[in-house]
């Protein structure tokens, strides 16, 4: 079973379309949050996620948008009510059972972190291995990661919609996970 993984789209529909093309045929697709920007909604991105059957969780940007501070942006007349409602009811985390493996989807960390950025070289990264899942898929840092913490495989697809300059590259990325083989790959691209 192949799972296509995107995260941190931040309203970038062309990047999502490119990622879908590059991931190729997959059995399922997941979005690990931040499909929108804190105070900006994207009908196009949310429609693509919904209409292409992405299993989607919320990130910190959705939490801001659907929180008290997002009341005014949510009232914009151009936002499609059905898309707004679809995104609003998506969970903040989710565990999938695929091919006998537990796959945990989170945006930031499996533990309550207040949106903390935990990168692969951080001391806290080892805490990912404390979960009972076989695989943790997470986003938030905008940095692609394939690593292990204990027996747990950790995959971060990086940012599919908004690259950050940490290593001098402005590449967007997504990932594909072969669940049976526990074999992930990162796909880097530019528009």
Predicted regions and their residues:
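Active-site-proximal segments of metal-dependent phosphoesterases and phosphodiesterases across multiple
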Residues: 70-76, 99-132, 162-165
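Conserved hydrophobic/aromatic beta-strand scaffold that supports enzyme active sites
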Residues: 93-95, 105, 174-176, 186
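Conserved beta-sheet core of the metallophosphoesterase superfamily
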Residues: 119-185
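Active-site-proximal beta-strand elements of phosphoester/diester hydrolases
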Residues: 2-10, 102-109, 153-158
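Short acidic-hydrophobic surface loop/beta-edge motif
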Residues: 92-100, 145-150
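Core catalytic region of metal-dependent phosphoesterases/phosphodiesterases
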Residues: 2-92, 96-97
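Active-site environment of divalent metal-dependent phosphoester hydrolases
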Residues: 10-15, 37-40, 62-67, 111-113, ...
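Short, solvent-exposed aromatic-acidic interface loops
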Residues: 185-191
């Amino acid at each position: 079973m192949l799972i296509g993984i995107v995260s941190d789209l931040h309203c970038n529909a062309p990047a999502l379309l490119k990622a879908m093309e590059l991931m190729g045929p997959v059995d399922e697709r997941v979005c690990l949050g931040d499909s929108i920007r804190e105070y900006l909604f994207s009908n196009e991105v949310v429609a693509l996620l919904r209409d292409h059957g992405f299993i989607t969780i919320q990130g910190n940007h959705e939490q801001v948008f659907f929180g008290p501070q997002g009341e005014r942006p949510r009232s914009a007349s151009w936002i499609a009510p059905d898309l707004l409602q679809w995104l609003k009811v998506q969970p903040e985390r989710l565990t999938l059972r695929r091919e006998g493996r537990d796959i945990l989807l989170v945006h930031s960390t499996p533990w309550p972190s207040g949106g903390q950025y935990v990168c692969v070289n951080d001391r806290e990264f080892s805490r990912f291995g404390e979960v009972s899942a076989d695989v943790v898929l997470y986003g938030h840092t905008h940095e692609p990661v394939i690593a292990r913490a204990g027996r747990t495989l950790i995959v971060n697809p990086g940012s599919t919609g908004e690259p950050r300059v940490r290593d001098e590259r402005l590449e967007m990325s997504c990932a594909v996970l072969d669940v049976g083989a526990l074999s992930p790959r990162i796909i880097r691209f530019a528009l």
